[in-house]
Amino acid sequence: MSASASLSAGSDASGPGSPAGDQGNALPQLDSLISHLVAAKRSLSSINHVWRANEIVTSARSALEESVVISARTGFLRRGLNNQLRLLYSVRSEVEEVSLRGRSEFASVLKSLDTADARLRKTLDSLRDTIVHASFRPEGEEPRSLHDFVDERGVEELRAALKSSIDRTNEAQAELDTSNSAFDDELQSIKQALGNYREATKLASSSSSSSSASNSSLPSLSSMPPMLQSLEMHAQEMANLLESLVQHFDLCVTAVKHTEGGGAAARSITGDMPAAVTVSGRGVPNIEQGIHDNLNAPLDPLSESDYQEMVNVLIKDAAEAEDVVMEIQDRIGDMESILENILSQRDVLLSIYNATIGVFRHLSSLATARLPGYIAQAHSFTRVWGEEHDRINGGLADLSDLNTLYDGFLEAYDGLILEVARRRHVRQRVEKVLRETKHKLDQLYEEDVNARETFRVEQGDYLPSDIWPGIGREPMRIEFRRISGGILKGAPPEQPDAQDQPAAEPNEPQSGPSETTEEGEIIPHLPKSLVEEALHRLKARNRQAM
């Protein structure tokens, strides 16, 4: 039973037959009653605790209302925040995919370019290393390689164009990397803000008494309404206890006033009473006004037995008043602890809300101010790479065409060597036929000459000289002439470098390595080793092509 209940029960239990009634034979002195009055007045200082209880209830109710609002706002922001974070990381993934895909394609194209350029350089080196045989060139000319017949300006211009495309792509890639790095810095800042958010949530989970708090992003508000109800109950009980103390004080005042010489003492003691207090919607009567009314009210006649009963109740209640004061102090201590718990939960919710607001503001700033730039940079790189990719592919095709052209030049030179060898072989066959034919014609000529001379000797004296003018002539002679060939059908025109000359006699001395222009056509005389090397290279190319 509470102290207030005990104090009230004591008032009801007192009566003429109670033990206190047995003490009625010896009425207390005025000093004793005054001491009880002073103690009762001192106990009324508990009104400060009741005031504080009222403040606690008001603060707790305000904290609960604020917590509900904060929790609702935080929940709304968290849902939007989660969606924005998913969208943000999706955008970052897409931007990174653009960078990786472009980098991979660029690396692949560069590898193909390096391969094509290395192949072209190798072909050009082969042209430099291949010296045109001196028999193909005018006498006295400095040695020349096949590379001397190639105009490399086209190659250099193509390489310059490719370098420009590569530099522009590298510049766009560097700008995208810088943009992505800034994007990552933004994400790192958001992660730090999220770290603060998680710390606040972790603190809320660790301080929550709910069994599922550790798995919840936000602390539950379910414990706060019961705590507020507990505070209201404490405040109400404290008001009731204070009211019982006031009643005890009024009883002391009445007893003192009914004691001879006590009126002045009562007015002196009750001259500085505290004001009234309102707790949980109900008001404690104005103490000062009540005491003033009690002091100034005329004394009702009181029998000795009634007076004795009043004194007995006063003495019994005086013994319990200290317990009532202690209970009020205990309750205010509990209320302070409960309020601290409520405010702590409110502060945790507020810290989560502030952390959420921080992340949300950061995301909003990023989305409106900087994110469009990061996305635009990715689009810019895609556009630049698309343009330069087409140019580089075109340049790659041109490099391949040039390499095919120069490689064809090498192959054609080897073919030229074999063609010269073939023509010389044909010339040799022609010369052989010519020699054999001339030898037979010479034989026929000698036989004809001898036969004509024999006829002249044997029959000439009998034939008149004018019978046939040709009877004394030698046989006709046949002479071979070398005539330069014309231009092959479809071949480009060129200036002839030899005049039609009569054929040399078989016994005439032969010319040097190359036939002279007197023979109608110049066919270089190539070493056998040169022809064999050219044939070997052509066969090797044919094997590679298969």
From Swiss-Prot:
TM segment ranges: none
A single GO molecular function term of this UniProt record: molecular adaptor activity
Skewed-composition ranges (Low complexity): 1-22, 496-506
Membrane topology qualifier: Peripheral membrane protein
Location within or outside the cell: Cytoplasm; Preautophagosomal structure membrane
One annotated GO biological process: autophagosome assembly
Superkingdom of the source species: Eukaryota
Record flagged with keyword Transport: no
Coiled coil: 312-341, 424-447
GO cellular component terms, A-Z: Atg1/ULK1 kinase complex; phagophore assembly site membrane
Keyword terms: Autophagy, Coiled coil, Cytoplasm, Membrane
Chief place where the protein resides: cytoplasm
Annotated region described as Disordered, given as residue ranges: 1-26, 204-225, 487-527
Similarity section: Belongs to the ATG17 family.
PANTHER family in the cross-refs: AUTOPHAGY-RELATED PROTEIN 17
Biological role stated in the UniProt entry: Autophagy-specific protein that functions in response to autophagy-inducing signals as a scaffold to recruit other ATG proteins to organize pre-autophagosomal structure (PAS) formation. Modulates the timing and magnitude of the autophagy response, such as the size of the sequestering vesicles. Plays particularly a role in pexophagy and nucleophagy.
Protein name as it appears in the record: Autophagy-related protein 17
Species of origin: Aspergillus niger (strain ATCC MYA-4892 / CBS 513.88 / FGSC A1513)
Gene (UniProt): atg17
